[in-house]
Amino acid sequence: ESFLAELRQVVGHDLDFEIDQYSPPLEARAEGGLYDVIVAVMQRHDPAAPVVPSLSTGGTDAKHIVPRRPGTQVYGFMPYRQQPGLEEMQLIHGHDERTSVDELLFATRVLYDVVINYTNSTETQ
């Protein structure tokens, strides 16, 4: 409802909106804890790669986690670097979905380091 109110401020009240499906929104903090670990790990692996919060308009498995564990911070983190000239974003969920071996190895190293660093940071708290 707050989103609709904000949307009406932008586009006016002359349009009608119909919500076909609704589930409570999920929001994760873009600071502290796991988020800071993700930023630090990405800075080590690729200092030029920004970590940017985004809004996902699709579904997410997080909707099954957060209701069972309120307060859980869930991030759809994908350590992925777009290769120049390659239309990889069009391949996501496509019939010919794929990624390069280099990107798979990069993502594996980054995710491994995120898990190790986050685990180590929570053990010292």
Each predicted region: which residue ranges?
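Metal-dependent amide/peptide-bond hydrolase catalytic core
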Residues: 1-125
